Amino acid sequence: MSEIRKPLLGFVHKLQDANASGSSGKTHCPTCLRLFKVPRLLPCLHTVCTTCLEKLDPFSVVDIRGGDSDTSSEGSVFQDPELCSLQPQIGILCPVCDAQVDLPLGGVKALTVDHLAMNDVLLENLRGEGQGLVCDLCSDREVEKRCQTCKANLCHFCCQAHRRQKKTTYHTMVDLKDLKGYSQVGKPILCPSHPAEELRLFCELCDRPVCRDCVVGEHREHPYDFTSNVIHKHGDSVRELLRDTQPHVEALEDALAQIKSVNNALQERVEAVAADVRTFSEGYIKAIEEHRDKLLQQLDDIRIQRETALQLQKAQLEQLLADMRTGVEFTEHLLTSGSDLEILITKGVVVERLRKLNKVEYSARPGVNHKICFSPQEKAGQCQGYEVYGAINTQEVDPAQCVLQGEDLHRAREKQTASFTLFCKDASGQSMGRGGDNVHVEVVPKDKKDSPIRTVVQDNKDGSYRVSYTPKEPGIYTVWVCIREQHVQGSPFNVTVRRKHRPHPGVFHCCTFCSSGGQKAARCACGGTMPGGYLGCGHGHKGHPGRPHWSCCGKFIEKSECSFTSGQGAPRSLLRTVAL
C-alpha cells in the first residue's frame, strides 16, 4: 500500500487536533465526531465511518495496475482474486493524517471492517444504559437483554420468543445493566460469502478466515484449522513486528528532544552574538550602527534558515512518530483487546503497515548545528567611508574539499619520520584560515589492523595541519584522515613503507680514472673500461655513461639509495676505488 503525503508543515496542525481527541478516538469517528457506524480500517491504521469515507472526494486517478501492485489495498481479506484485473486506481486522503489511500477494487466497502472499534462502540452504548441500541432481530425495539450464546442483543418480545424456541431455550440471557463491567461483548462475525455461517476457521493457503461452507467450496483441499488453534502462530508474528517497531518510537522521541535542545542552543547563541555585535558597534555612531544592523540582519537570516531546517526535520520526525505511535497503539490494543478472530482479520493490514514503518529511513541527528560566532577583529570593508570590523562566521570545514599534500604522502621509510600536510577548506573550496578542527588520523598496517601507529597532528592555526608518524616495519599501511567522523578527500589511502635508507659505500664521480688518480686496477659499477689495461671507466671510452654516477651501483642521482647488494660479487678493486 503506497502512501503519498501532502506538505508536512500543514499536517502538524491536523496531527495535534487528532491527538487532542484522546480516548474518544476508539469509539468516535474523527470526521463526523459521532459513534462509529460500520467503521473501516485504513492502511495507515486510522478508523473512519463507511459513510464518511464515501463522502470524501477521490484524490486522483493514480495509474493502471494489476492485482499484484504494491499500491493495491490488502485491507479486505475477502477480496475476490478474479477482480484483480487492470482497472483505474482511485485514491482518497485519510482525514486524520492526510496519507493517500489507494482504494481496493471494491471501493470503500472493500476495506477491512474494524470489529474492534465496533466492540468499543457497543460497550460505550452499554455504559450509557443501552440508549440507542435496537434489537438485532426485529430492529424496532430497544434492547433489554443479551444472549451470551448467540451474542445477540434482544428486545423484551424477541427475548421471550428466543426462550420459546427449542434450539435456544437453554441459551444464557443477561440484562444490559449486568454487562457494564464487560470488556468485550462483540457480535459473531459472519462470512460475507455465506451470511448464515460464522467465521470460525482459518485458511493457511489464502491467509484469511473462512467458514465451514468455504472449506467445502472455494477453499476445498486448502489447509485450514480453527482460529483458536492458529492464533498463537499468527499472533506471535504480529508481536515480533511490534517489538521491532517500538524502539523506533523511543529513537524518534530522543531525536525530537535533541532538536529542541539544538533549537534552544541556537536561540541562546543568536542572542549572545547579537549582544556582541551591539557592544562592538557603539563606538562608531552612524557608520557602525549601519554596520551593526547589517550584521543583525545577516544573523537573523541564518537563524531563520536554520530554524526552518530544524522545524522541517521536526515536522517530518513528528509525523513519522505519529505514524509509529498509531501503529504501535493500534497493534497493542488489537493484541490485548481483540479476539482471536479480530486479530486474524486485521492481521494483514497491521502487518503490512508495521513492515512499511520499519523500513522508513530517518536521521536521528539534527540536520543543522548552532555553530555561529562573531569575529570583531575581522575586516568587514567600509561603511559610509569608514573602515569597519566585525563579521558573522558560519564557515565550516567540508571534509570532501580538504586536500592532502606532501612528498611522504604515499611512501615512507622504516624507523624514519614521515609527514604530510592537510589543508582544510569549506564547501566552496575556500581555505578555513583558522585552526581548531577535530582532525583524526590513523595509520594501520594492512596485515596488523589491530596495531595502529602513533600519529602526531600539529595545528598550524591557519587551516592546515601537519601529520607525522614513524613506521616501525616495512610493508603496506593504510592511512585514515577524518574530520568530524568523515573522510577527507583522498582518504583512506595506502602508504608503501620501504626498508631503512641504504647509503652509498662508493663515490659519486665523473669516471674511475679521475676518482682513483689513474689507477689501472680500479673498477666502476657502470661497467666502462679504457685501453691500456685500465679496468675502470674513463671519459669518452667504451661503456662510460656520459654523466656523473656512483661507483658502487652506477646510479646517476647523487641523493639516492644504493642498489648494490653483496650477491653481485663486486671485485676488490671496486672497493679500493671506494676507499680512494
Curated annotation (Swiss-Prot):
In residue numbers, the zinc fingers (B box-type) are 130-176, 186-227
Filamin repeat windows: 394-497
- What GO terms fall under cellular component here? cytosol; intercellular bridge; nucleoplasm
The positions annotated for binding Zn(2+) 2 are: C191, H194, C214, H219
Q: Mention one GO biological process in which this protein takes part, according to its record.
A: protein K48-linked ubiquitination
Q: What residues bind Zn(2+) 1, as annotated? A: C135, C138, C158, H162
Q: Which residues form a coiled coil?
A: 249-329
What is an example of a GO molecular function annotated in this UniProt entry? zinc ion binding
- Phenotype upon gene inactivation: Deletion mutant mice show earlier onset of death and exhibit higher mortality in response to lethal challenge with LPS. The production of TNF-alpha, IL-6, and IL-1beta is also significantly up-regulated after TLR challenge.
- EC number(s) per entry: 2.3.2.27
Keyword match Zinc: yes
Which enzyme class, named as a word? transferase
Query: Where is this protein localized, as stated in its record?
Result: Cytoplasm; Nucleus
Per UniProt, the RING-type Zn-finger stretches lie at 29-98
Q: Where are the transmembrane segments?
A: none
Q: What is the reaction catalyzed? A: S-ubiquitinyl-[E2 ubiquitin-conjugating enzyme]-L-cysteine + [acceptor protein]-L-lysine = [E2 ubiquitin-conjugating enzyme]-L-cysteine + N(6)-ubiquitinyl-[acceptor protein]-L-lysine
Q: Which UniProt keywords apply?
A: Coiled coil, Cytoplasm, Metal-binding, Nucleus, Repeat, Transferase, Ubl conjugation pathway, Zinc, Zinc-finger
SMART domains per the record? BBC (SM00502), BBOX (SM00336), IG_FLMN (SM00557), RING (SM00184)
What is the stated purpose of this protein?
E3 ubiquitin-protein ligase that plays a role in the regulation of inflammatory response. Mechanistically, mediates the 'Lys-48'-linked polyubiquitination of TAB2, a regulatory protein of the kinase TAK1, leading to its degradation via the proteasomal pathway and inhibition of the TLR-mediated inflammatory immune response. May act as a transcriptional repressor in mitogen-activated protein kinase signaling pathway.
The UniProt similarity line reads:
Belongs to the TRIM/RBCC family.
Q: What is this protein called?
A: E3 ubiquitin-protein ligase TRIM45
